[in-house]
């Protein structure tokens, strides 16, 4: 699960802490507001340099125009404070929430495709201190060291203890500087919730705000949310309460499976970044791994690859439209001359639902054919798909999907969902 390796500075910042962090509501966790979208990213630079490429529109609209985490992965003590301060200032001016991912721990990725980081833990602490100075007390969401807790196979018992101490110190240092800090929980197909809870406890999650999961991976949001609930319960049983989850949804809108996405064309971008999760245990869905950046299998880790970005973009995915206690997101999964195939993901809100109905309007020349995973009716240009008996009841945050074949021009319908 190698995250991107590139020079990147991200601080999730808002000028006023009260505007960013709330005490939590029934519809979301402890974050509010919109995420900061940096203008100068690898995806945006590629789009600007390739205006006539056939892939440009899709990459621009579905990836470059979305906010994604900005990584601090280049260990440079001379420039890091100014870099962070500049970014935090830009975010505060925009009134948005940028996301800072720190990726500089020694022995990161256990020497794999994203190897690098600080030469030792003392230097690492100096680096963290400079980042904290750059934050200067401004509210900041921080994704602290992907893989650092879930991936320990290359470390001895003494090295694990030293890393835990370093992460604990980093969390406290960054929180004192205004940080909202989340620690590494791996993902739902890796360590068990019980094992990961033990590791998080040892790494000082009691002094952090929560944990993140699915970074650089492809597991569904529903699976990650279920894993998060189990992990929160495991932490609670150890006397560590009040922790919440962040889920990386940058690449979990298609196939799951092996962590490396450099050669897999079945992967898609997932839920757009948002703090409106509809789940009090989940603070945000964030694109931690910027879509289009390689894992290190076929291409250099962290390098932007337009073919990967275009494959992940697939077809436009409209943001969830909340109505009642469910939301729906549309994605075109394939298209051909005269027709296309679409897929809709239904997500329950903060309360369980017994059923759902999704509605959208056909454009000129479109008609719906076969539908699977739901029961369709059409009235004029309005299509309504209701759940089957086996996929209508959803727990809070759980998802169901249906698909359909259609004739006519491809479009991106504004799908809406109501609970039945």
What is the meaning of each model-derived region?
Residues 1-28:
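Secretory targeting and sorting signals
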Residues 37-64, 173, 188-312:
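Surface-exposed substrate-engagement region within the catalytic domains
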Residues 352-379:
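Short acidic, flexible loop segments centered on an aromatic residue
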Residues 336-343, 400-401:
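Short, solvent-exposed loop/turn segments enriched in Ser/Thr/Gly
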Residues 322-338, 349:
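Low-complexity, acidic Ser/Thr/Pro/Gly-rich terminal tails and inter-domain linkers that flank the onset
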Residues 30-134, 138, 290-305, 309-312, ...:
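N-terminal carbohydrate-binding/catalytic regions of secreted carbohydrate-active enzymes
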Residues 327, 396, 401-420:
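Terminal connector regions
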Residues 114-138, 146-178, 193-197:
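Active-site cleft segment of glycoside hydrolase catalytic domains centered on the general acid/base Glu
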């Amino acid at each position: 699960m190698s995250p991107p390796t590139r020079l990147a500075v991200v601080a999730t910042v808002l000028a006023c802490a009260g505007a960013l962090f709330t005490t939590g509501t029934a519809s979301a966790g402890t974050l509010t507001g919109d995420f900061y979208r940096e203008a100068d990213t690898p995806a945006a630079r590629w789009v600007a340099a390739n205006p006539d490429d056939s892939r440009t529109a899709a990459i621009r609209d579905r990836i470059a125009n979305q906010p994604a985490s900005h990584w601090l992965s280049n260990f440079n003590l001379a420039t890091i404070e100014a870099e962070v301060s500049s970014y935090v200032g830009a975010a505060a001016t925009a009134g948005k929430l940028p996301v800072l991912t720190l990726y500089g721990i020694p022995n990161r990725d256990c020497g794999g495709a994203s190897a690098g980081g600080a030469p030792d833990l003392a230097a690492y602490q100096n680096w963290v201190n400079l980042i904290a100075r750059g934050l200067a007390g401004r509210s900041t969401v921080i994704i602290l060291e992907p893989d650092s807790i879930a991936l320990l196979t290359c470390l001895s018992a003494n090295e694990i203890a030293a890393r835990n101490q370093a992460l604990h110190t980093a969390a406290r240092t960054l929180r004192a500087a205004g940080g909202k800090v989340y620690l590494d929980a791996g993902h739902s197909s890796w360590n068990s919730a019980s094992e990961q809870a033990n590791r998080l406890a040892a790494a000082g999650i009691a002094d952090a705000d929560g944990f993140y999961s699915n970074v650089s991976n492809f597991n569904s949001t529903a699976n990650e949310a279920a894993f998060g609930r189990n992990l929160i319960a495991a932490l609670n049983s150890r006397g560590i309460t009040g922790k919440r989850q962040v889920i990386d949804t940058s690449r979990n809108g298609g196939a799951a499976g092996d962590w490396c996405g450099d050669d897999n064309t079945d992967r898609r971008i997932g839920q757009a970044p948002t703090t409106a999760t509809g789940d009090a245990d989940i603070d945000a869905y964030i694109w931690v791994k910027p879509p289009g950046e390689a894992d290190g299998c076929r291409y250099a880790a962290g390098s932007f690859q337009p073919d990967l970005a275009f494959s992940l973009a697939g077809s436009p995915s409209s943001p969830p439209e909340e109505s009642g206690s469910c939301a729906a997101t549309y994605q075109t999964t394939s298209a051909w001359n005269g027709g296309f195939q679409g897929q809709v993901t239904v997500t329950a809100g903060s309360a369980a639902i017994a059923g759902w109905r999704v509605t959208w309007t056909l454009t000129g020349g479109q008609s719906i054919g076969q539908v699977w995973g739901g029961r369709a009716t059409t009235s004029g240009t309005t299509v309504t798909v209701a759940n089957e008996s086996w996929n209508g009841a959803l727990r809070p945050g759980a998802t169901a999907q249906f698909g359909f074949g259609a004739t006519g021009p491809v479009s991106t319908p504004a799908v809406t969902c109501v609970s039945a």
